[in-house]
Amino acid sequence: MGQVTLEPLKIPDRIRMEVTAEREWTEAANRLRARVLLPAAFAAPAPILPGEHRVFMVFNRKGGAGKTTTTLELACAWAAMGYSVRVLDCDPQDAGLSGWLEPVYPEGMAVENRKTLKDVLYGKAGLDEATYFTRYTNVYIVPSYEDCAVAEYDPSVSSERILRRAIKQSEAPVDITIVDCPPKIGKLSTYTLAIGGKIIVPSQVSALDAKSGESLRQAITDAQDDYDVETVAAVLTAWDATNIAKSVGNQMAVDYPGALVCPVRKTVDARTAPDQMKSIREFAPRSTTTRDFDQLGRLLVAPREEVAA
């Protein structure tokens, strides 16, 4: 199997976003600059030590917010930093993450022997059995497809801690698990949030996303009351210099005071990469979108080489 090894990026200062302690954009739209807004209590990220494991959940109640793109690009960014990353596709659809980041099955494995998230939920396979290589070195996936949605309504799948236990029982040497959560509030989203960890909230810069912001914030507040989770980043996907970008960004800073707010600038490459079945990082490593996701990844986790620093 020929895999693609994702390399670290060198981001020129003229491209890199300013990182600031300010919590709002005040300039006019025609002068709007992409900046990362840090929370007051922000601490520089630490590298992941050998034997340590961190969980990130990418969550939004609305489809089209950039959730799947954020999941894949952060996984690729962290792999390029030297980490092994397992992606849990918990948003089952045939045209979702598992169709974009396809699992690479062992040669000769019969279709009926291929495990998915559904098998994990039904107790027919452990998480490691359902974990497969992908086209990228150090990026693995637990795939899911439309048939997994049956677990949403099946009373026999009733333990909300099932995925949390599956991760704890895993023996795979994975540094980071990143979860593409389902947009619908239901059993599957409950299972993902019950894992515990750090929530990343992507929101597309649009009027519709602005209108849905209150219900999203309430859902995350409820999750923080019930589970061991914290919101660490709000990501403004498809960002451009407009009044709506300014409005959505400023509202996200208010809604998630403990999270960094990070724009990811819109480019043609970001729309084209899925058609080529490639991550944006592979398809256009020098694009602004790739570099913004890379900068976000480094604000959440320090590169592996810093362990020895």
Regions found by a protein language model. Give the residues of each.
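Phosphate-binding loop that captures ATP/GTP phosphates
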Residues: 81-85, 91-141
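Conserved catalytic-core segment of NTP-binding enzymes
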Residues: 5, 81, 86, 171-262
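Extreme N-terminal, non-catalytic leader segments
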Residues: 2-61
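Conserved nucleotide-binding/hydrolysis micro-motifs of P-loop NTPases
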Residues: 92-94, 136, 147-149, 206-207, ...
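Walker A/P-loop phosphate-binding motif and the immediately C-terminal alpha-helix
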Residues: 48-93
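Beta-strand-loop-alpha "switch" segments that mediate conformational coupling across diverse proteins
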Residues: 12, 238-243, 249-281, 293
